């Protein structure tokens, strides 16, 4: 596994487009193919660093970059429907690598009246299921999502949902505090020097999304710039220091996880395994452990896995199922009417 980050310039443009700011159809057209090219470069870097020939690759699974996600029906031009929008042209990858590429997974679940998320629980069931323990899996990417695997569960017993913001709010606040010089609080070091502002935390925990019952999903369209602006405005009015503000929004993510477990799990998990970029934030991991004292809180690294690889592994598994025409959504998780084969194939 290798992690290849976007350049600051590309990241800023993705955030601009995904934030709903002024943009033309041409911007999205270009971005679709730019992402395809960047994914190719990342794949070539991986092959070069691992000594893998391009001709040895049999299949590529590519989720792409989400730009907008509307999981609940909205009325548009007289019609009511759900929708989701990811970019990163799979045909560009297919041309460069000369192998089948499976991409654009979420739309098929949404077409079946599902939420289109989370999709990782399919692979989590295969990898982490236990005969004797209730295992909770908390992914902390931009958005947090949690999966519950009851002891000896079947696939149809699995349930999962988005817990709320993962790193998204923390990163946006830290970017504001540093004037854009830094985009995330590495290791949670800055937050570790602050104290939680209880009044602000209480206000954040009144967030209506938290009390919505699963299945549910959310994204930048909810926890994006407008949400963060309210936090920053409040912090300025109340003269909350930067470190206290970071400590508060970090604990907020931890408390959304606690709330989700306490309100929506059928039983207390024996252990909770944290994955995604948030697992690298020691302050956040400690906050989760403090919030769930009766649960063993681990990271994927504690089990010998790479947290950053979790979603890459998940979409490789999903792509393999697609090629063999295997249903790869989990209707009990997404709320879809029926099992479907997700992913579009570029040959």
Where are each of the predicted segments found?
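Short beta-strand-loop/turn "lid" adjacent to the catalytic site in phosphate-handling enzymes
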Residues: 22-87
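Short glycine-rich, Thr/Ser-proximal phosphate-binding strand/loop in the N-terminal lobe
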Residues: 1-26, 158
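Phosphate-binding/catalytic loop of phosphoryl-transfer enzymes
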Residues: 77-84, 91, 95, 99-182, ...
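Conserved ATP-utilizing enzyme core subdomain
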Residues: 3-6, 153-254, 258, 325, ...
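Conserved phosphate-binding/catalytic loops in two-lobed NTP-binding clefts
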Residues: 289-314
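Phosphate/ATP-binding catalytic cores across multiple sugar-kinase/actin-like superfamilies
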Residues: 38-46, 242-268
């Amino acid at each position: 596994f290798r992690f290849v980050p976007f350049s600051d310039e590309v990241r800023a443009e993705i955030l601009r487009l995904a934030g709903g700011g002024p943009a033309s159809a041409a911007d999205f057209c270009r971005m679709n193919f730019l992402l395809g090219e960047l994914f190719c470069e990342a794949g070539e870097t991986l092959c070069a660093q691992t000594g893998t020939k391009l001709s040895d690759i049999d299949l590529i699974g590519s989720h792409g970059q989400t730009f907008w996600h509307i999981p609940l029906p909205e009325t548009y031009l007289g019609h009511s429907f759900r929708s989701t929008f990811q970019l990163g042209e799979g045909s560009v990858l297919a041309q460069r690598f000369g192998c089948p590429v499976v991409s654009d997974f979420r739309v098929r679940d949404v077409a079946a009246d599902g939420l289109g998320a989370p999709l990782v629980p399919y692979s989590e069931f295969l990898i982490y299921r236990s005969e004797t323990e209730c295992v909770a899996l908390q992914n902390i990417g931009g958005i947090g999502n949690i999966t519950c695997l009851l002891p000896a569960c079947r696939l149809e017993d699995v349930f999962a949902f988005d817990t709320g913001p993962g790193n998204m709010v923390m990163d946006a606040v830290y970017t504001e505090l540093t004037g854009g010089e830094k985009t995330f609080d590495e290791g949670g070091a800055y937050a570790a020097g602050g104290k939680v502002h209880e009044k602000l935390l209480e206000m954040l925990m009144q967030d209506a999304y938290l009390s919505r019952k699963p299945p549910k999903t959310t994204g930048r369209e909810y926890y994006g710039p407008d949400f963060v602006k309210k936090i920053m405005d409040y912090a300025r009015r109340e003269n909350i220091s930067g470190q206290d503000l970071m400590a508060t929004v970090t604990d907020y993510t931890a408390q959304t996880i606690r709330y989700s477990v306490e309100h929506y799990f059928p039983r207390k998990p024996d252990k909770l395994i944290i994955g995604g970029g948030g697992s690298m934030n020691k302050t956040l991991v400690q906050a989760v452990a403090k919030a769930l004292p009766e649960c063993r809180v681990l990271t994927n690294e504690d089990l010998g896995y790479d947290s950053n690889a979790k979603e890459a592994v998940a979409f490789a598994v999903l792509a393999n199922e697609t090629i063999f025409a295997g249903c790869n959504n989990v209707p009990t998780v997404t709320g879809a009417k029926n099992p479907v084969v997700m992913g579009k194939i570029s040959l």
